[in-house]
Each structure stands twice: as C-alpha cells, then as structure tokens.
Amino acid sequence: MTQEWDKVFAKSEKVEHEKVSFHNHFGLELAADVYKPKHAQGRLAAVAVCGPFGAVKEQSSGLYAQALAERGFLAIAFDPSFTGESSGQPRDMFSLDINTEDFQAAVDYLSNRPDVEANRIGIVGICGWGGIALNAAAADPRIKATVASTMYDMPRVGAWGYFDQGTADERYKAKEQIAALRTKEYTTGLKQRAGGCIPVDQLTGKEPDFVQQYSAYYKTKRGYHQRSVNSNGGWMLQAQTGWMNNNILAHPEDLRNAVLIVHGEKAHSRYMGEDTFKKLKGDNKQLIIVDGATHTDLYDQMDKIPFDRIAAFFNKYLK
C-alpha cells in the first residue's frame, strides 16, 4: 500500500492517520485508512465508511472518515474488494454479496481493535454504497447506526435505468449482449469496460446535469484519483448483470437499528433515498434533505455535507 498522503483532500491537523488492512470471509484483503482523534484515550465509538460506488478511499469516503474523526470517532475508509489497493482478481469488479460482506468485515476488524468499543460501531455508505450499507445493516445487528449519504439503489438503476425509464425488453437485450461477451471473454480474459466518467473537455453541454457533475468531480483535480474506477476506465462490463437480478434491503423489517438517509434537494438520485426511507420501520429512522445540494455536492462540499448532524446521529445511537 502507498504510505504517502495521496488523498484528494487536505490532511487534518486534528487527527492521526495510519494505513491498515483486514480480511473479509471470502479471504480477500481490504486496504483501509484509519483516522483517529489526536490525543484520544480509551475505547472510542467507531465508524466504517465506503463509497461512492466506483471511488476509492482517497476520495469522498476518506473525507467523511476524517471529518468524523475530527468529531471524536475512530473512523476507517476502505477500498472495496477488487478495487483500489484491496485484493481480488479480476480488477474493477463488483458483487452485491461480496461488497455487503466488505462492510461486515470492516465491523469484524473494528470490533477487534483495542481502542474501539465493540458495541458502538456504525457505518456510512456514500452513493451506491449507501444502499449496500443498508443491506449490511439489515444483515448484521452489530451495526448499531447507519448513514446512507446521497444514496443510490444500484439494483434499481441497473434493472430499470434512471428514473425507472427502462423496460424489460431493454434489460433482456443488455443481458443478451453481456452473455455474448462472457462467451468471448472466457478465453481472452475480462477486457471490455463499461466506461468511466466523460473527460471534461469531451462534454458537449447537452448531457444531463448529473453526468456533467460526475465529470466535474471524478475527471478534474477536485476529485480525480489514479486508482479510482470512475476516474478512469470504469467497471468491467460483465459485472453489470449482477445488478439486474438482485435487490438491496430484501427484508427492511430486519433493519431494526438506527438509520439516517441524507440527500440533496437537487440530487437526481433523491427519489431513491426517499423511496427507500418509506420502507424503513421504527422511530429511529431519519431523513435529511440538504437545501440546494446536488448529488455530488455531498461528495466533498464541506458547506453542504451535514457532518455535525451526522455526528449527532452517531452520538445518539452509538451510546
């Protein structure tokens, strides 16, 4: 793992930072950054952070982890399996099952740290990892509080497209194309990618606002990172069918612990968070809509991300 500071955000003087790794139950080694309040003593409440989907720990998840450490938590940001500095072959693949396990493995790791109070662990998922975080929390009662920030329901988008405008015939055609690709790539190895974000100088201005906003983050100095899937060639195309036959939060009634969903008022993805929130049960579920914020504003805009409210949520439920 790279030891020098190579994040897209500035290092805080209020926290200590170290690189660590931990394994999931599939035997994959995950790379992580630990952020801890300076001069902290005793066992702390801890939070594991991942996302956005297609990003690495040097991007938004690291920023969130560092901001939470500034507010008194031990926080880790990790690279999912098959991406960044984590292990797994082939590279730049995803799996709802394995990625849900990645969050649970982070809880395994935190639960065994001597400076963490094992019954005071929460998680944060950003973008597509917001949905995966809820999936993990529904499966794992050790996760006492979950934040899904600017969340995507990736299986919903994968199966029906943005704003549910896709059709079953379109989905079947995509499956046929990927099935043919699988036959070909069985002998050649995985080669074809879905494509990352569009370079800024190739944008025409006619793209949807959210497409331009993704490029403004992933393809500029603001958020570009050399190990980020979205900043470069994108995911392996074969993986895409994984979203078409799965769902997140199959049993929302099992998610008994606290949940906070955070979305931007102007986020194209807002409907996913609001619809998911409607499925949740109990008075320990909260929804925050950030005035004027877009989807990617909640990646890194410190004046838009409600870190103090997120910290207050964790302080309340990680007692």
Tell what function each PLM region has.
Residues M93-P114:
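Alpha/beta-hydrolase active-site loop
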Residues A293-K304:
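Catalytic histidine-centered segment of alpha/beta-hydrolase-like enzymes
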Residues L255, I261-H263:
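Short beta-strand/loop motif that positions the catalytic acidic residue
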Residues T2-G42:
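N-terminal cap/lid segment of alpha/beta-hydrolase-fold proteins
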Residues A67-S87:
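Conserved alpha/beta-hydrolase
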Residues L134-K219:
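Alpha/beta-hydrolase-fold enzymes
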Residues R43-P52:
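Short beta-strand element of the alpha/beta-hydrolase
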Residues G54-Q66, P80:
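The serine-hydrolase catalytic nucleophile loop
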